[in-house]
Amino acid sequence: MAQLKITLTRSAAHRLPKQRKIVKELGLARVNSSVIKPDNAATRGAIFQISHLVSVEEIKD
């Protein structure tokens, strides 16, 4: 199964509380921090809601 590398490219400060919560739950703390998450519907949904704050790369196993 493919995985996604998610990088926070813009700050979550001054954003809606829901968007800040999503950033925190994905494990992103600071600008330019990255996490690797499984490519599933839940992760894709979270990325969709904060797509203007993150960049996503697909990592193939």
Curated annotation (Swiss-Prot):
InterPro entries with a match to the protein in the record: Ribo_uL30_ferredoxin-like_sf (IPR036919), Ribosomal_uL30_bac-type (IPR005996), Ribosomal_uL30_ferredoxin-like (IPR016082)
BP terms from Gene Ontology: translation
Keyword Transmembrane in record: no
Domain of life of the native organism: Bacteria
Key words, A-Z: Ribonucleoprotein, Ribosomal protein
Classification via CDD domains: Ribosomal_L30
An example Gene Ontology CC term for this record: large ribosomal subunit
GO molecular function, one term: structural constituent of ribosome
SUPFAM superfamilies listed in its UniProt record: Ribosomal protein L30p/L7e (SSF55129)
TM stretches of this protein: none
Quaternary assembly: Part of the 50S ribosomal subunit.
HAMAP family noted in UniProt: Ribosomal_uL30_B (MF_01371_B)
Similarity field: Belongs to the universal ribosomal protein uL30 family.
Record protein name field: Large ribosomal subunit protein uL30
Species whose genome carries this gene: Lacticaseibacillus paracasei (strain ATCC 334 / BCRC 17002 / CCUG 31169 / CIP 107868 / KCTC 3260 / NRRL B-441)
Lineage of producing organism: Bacteria, Bacillati, Bacillota, Bacilli, Lactobacillales
